[in-house]
């Protein structure tokens, strides 16, 4: 039976500062490193053994995966990285303080930019220090497909081809697949797997550093409800994510 393990990266330095991060490459905070280590301990304690790893191209997801797999004694498994698993591109909001952005735009527009399904923030200018123009990570990617801003709908559009064409093959061969990625790329994947509506996806918050497990059937649909390896910590973490921007 295919098994999928989703891990949102641990707290990053910009999560700690309450900044919109998106495609800006920042590292894990000290707390984030601890969360990643705990994720690995949970994998080992619960006997969930990934056979192959997928991550985004961003350091915080890569760090999380490396720390977790070392704790789980699985650092040796094959690794694949793709920009298609990157966080949502937050456009002109990248690098901005969430609380200040809330004050500037008001709660309705802030929530629209942050949580609506199909409304992206204003695009980032190529001259911005938080733009990815010229970033070496993407030098082999067609520049016409690289975003300057994204909604969750656009994240799903660029994520699903990679899921269907690449990740699915490992799952269908019976492997346990671990994906270490980001709040919005993982929300998009969970939406696809669970058939969550465009309206209801706004309510889904994925906590940092706690493995979420899907047991899938031969059609890669959940054969039972998904579950966190630490449900109590996951509930508290999801509530903290929901409150971001309010301090």
Swiss-Prot record:
It is a peripheral membrane protein. The lineage of its organism: Eukaryota, Fungi, Dikarya, Ascomycota, Saccharomycotina. It catalyses: (2R)-2-phosphoglycerate = (2R)-3-phosphoglycerate. One of its GO terms (molecular function) is phosphoglycerate mutase activity. CDD domains: HP_PGM_like (cd07067). InterPro entries: His_Pase_superF_clade-1, His_PPase_superfam, PG/BPGM_mutase_AS, Phosphogly_mut1. This is Phosphoglycerate mutase 1. The modification Phosphoserine is found at residues 12, 116, 127-128, 185, 197. It comes from Saccharomyces cerevisiae (strain ATCC 204508 / S288c). Pathway: Carbohydrate degradation; glycolysis; pyruvate from D-glyceraldehyde 3-phosphate: step 3/5. It is an enzyme of class 5 (isomerase). Present with 172000 molecules/cell in log phase SD medium.
């Amino acid at each position: 039976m295919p098994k999928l393990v989703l891990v949102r990266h641990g707290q990053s330095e910009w999560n700690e500062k309450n900044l919109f991060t998106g495609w800006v490459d920042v590292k894990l905070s000290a707390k984030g490193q601890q969360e990643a280590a705990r994720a690995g301990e949970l994998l080992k304690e619960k006997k969930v053994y990934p056979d192959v790893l997928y991550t985004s191209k961003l350091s915080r997801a890569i760090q999380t995966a490396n720390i977790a797999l070392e704790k789980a004694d699985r650092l040796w498994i094959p690794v694949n990285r793709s920009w298609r698993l990157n966080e949502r591109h937050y456009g002109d909001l990248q690098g901005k303080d969430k609380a200040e952005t809330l004050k500037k735009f008001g709660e309705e527009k802030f929530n629209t930019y942050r949580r609506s399904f199909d409304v992206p923030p204003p695009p980032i200018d190529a001259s911005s220090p938080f733009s990815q123009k010229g970033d070496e990570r993407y030098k082999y990617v067609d520049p016409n497909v690289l975003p300057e801003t994204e909604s969750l709908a656009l994240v799903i559009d660029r994520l699903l081809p990679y899921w269907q064409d690449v990740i699915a093959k490992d799952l269908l061969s019976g492997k346990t697949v671990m994906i270490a990625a980001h709040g919005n790329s993982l929300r998009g994947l969970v939406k696809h797997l669970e058939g969550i509506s465009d309206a209801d996806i706004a309510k889904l918050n994925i906590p940092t550093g706690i493995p979420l497990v899907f047991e899938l059937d031969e059609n890669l649909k959940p054969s039972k409800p998904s579950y966190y390896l630490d449900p109590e910590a996951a509930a508290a973490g999801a509530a903290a994510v929901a409150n971001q921007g309010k301090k």
